[in-house]
């Protein structure tokens, strides 16, 4: 039995075996010739018992001129490359496998960005947060002006009537300055307005009509009439007292 090159070229510490002479005396080992690394002294292909797997690089000659060739070793357990600690070294004529390429170094700009903002989410996952609408955005904030403000609805905006709506309302006001409830509902449905809007428009239009025709206000006339009646009632007793005073004066002169 020929000693394999695995035991000779291994980097492990040699175990405590008996000297080589004892093996020679016992007939375990034959004489080693010049074709030690070749396959000339071996009758068939020999595969050493490899402890670590060897990747399949194709059938390559193991020796430098022997007829025998070595096939790939079957994979076992660990996955270290040959030639490492405890691995099988290549023969002088066998090409060495190329070492794996190192990973590409990251760009300095990208690394600086990643270190400066570690909490930044990936570009593909953008978070969409719903907009928060607070109560003070919905209502008029006047608590600082009026402390008794309870947060009611803001003042209603003015109604913008269209040209067609104003034309129809003016036509109706030309014939009837006062509307009945039934007629007001009909106009509201026709012009797509509310009954309250029709009522307010007619009130404002009547005030404008009175101002254009210079008619006295009914409230002003009632107040002026009441004041004139009170003045007349106060002056009447004084006029009645004057003749009585004159009669009394004549009576005194006659005496």
From Swiss-Prot:
Where is region (Disordered) located? 28-128, 212-255
User: What Pfam families does its record include?
Assistant: Homeodomain (PF00046)
Q: Which UniProt keywords apply?
A: Developmental protein, DNA-binding, Homeobox, Nucleus, Transcription, Transcription regulation
Record field: compositional bias (Basic and acidic residues): 245-255
Highest taxon above the source species: Eukaryota
The cellular component terms of Gene Ontology attached to this UniProt record, alphabetical and capped at eight, are: nucleoplasm
Residues forming the motif Antp-type hexapeptide are 133-138
Report if keyword 4Fe-4S is assigned.
no
DNA-binding region of this protein: 154-213
Q: Which subcellular locations apply to this protein?
A: Nucleus
Q: Name one GO molecular function term.
A: RNA polymerase II cis-regulatory region sequence-specific DNA binding
Q: Where is the composition biased (Pro residues)?
A: 94-107
Coiled-coil annotation reads: none
What family, per the record?
Belongs to the Antp homeobox family. Deformed subfamily.
**How does the record describe its quaternary structure?**
Forms a DNA-binding heterodimer with transcription factor PBX1.
Record's function text = Sequence-specific transcription factor which is part of a developmental regulatory system that provides cells with specific positional identities on the anterior-posterior axis.
This chain belongs to the protein called Homeobox protein Hox-D4
The organism encoding this protein is Ateles geoffroyi
Q: Which gene encodes it?
A: HOXD4
């Amino acid at each position: 039995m020929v000693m394999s090159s695995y035991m000779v070229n291994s980097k492990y510490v040699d175990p405590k075996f008996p000297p080589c002479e004892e093996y020679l005396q016992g007939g375990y080992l034959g004489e080693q010739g010049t074709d030690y690394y070749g396959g000339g002294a071996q009758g068939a292909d020999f595969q050493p018992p490899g402890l670590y797997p060897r990747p399949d690089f194709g059938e390559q000659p193991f020796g430098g001129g022997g007829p025998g060739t070595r096939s790939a070793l079957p994979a076992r357990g660990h996955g270290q490359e040959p030639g490492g600690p405890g691995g099988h070294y290549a023969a002088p004529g066998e090409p060495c496998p190329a070492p794996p390429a190192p990973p590409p170094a990251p760009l300095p700009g990208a690394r600086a960005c990643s270190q400066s903002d570690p909490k930044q989410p990936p570009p593909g996952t953008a978070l969409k947060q719903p907009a928060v609408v607070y109560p003070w955005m919905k209502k008029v904030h006047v608590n600082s002006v009026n402390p008794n403000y309870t947060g009611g609805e803001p003042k209603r905006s003015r109604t913008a009537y269209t040209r067609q709506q104003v034309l129809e309302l003016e036509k109706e006001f030309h014939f009837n300055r006062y509307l009945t409830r039934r007629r007001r509902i009909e106009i509201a449905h026709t012009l797509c307005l509310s009954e309250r809007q029709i009522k307010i428009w007619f009130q404002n239009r009547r005030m404008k009509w009175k101002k254009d025709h210079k008619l006295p206000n009914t409230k002003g006339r009632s107040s002026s009439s009441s004041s004139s009646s009170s003045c007349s009632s106060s002056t009447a007793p004084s006029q009645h007292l004057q003749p009585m005073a004159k009669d009394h004066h004549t009576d005194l002169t006659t005496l």
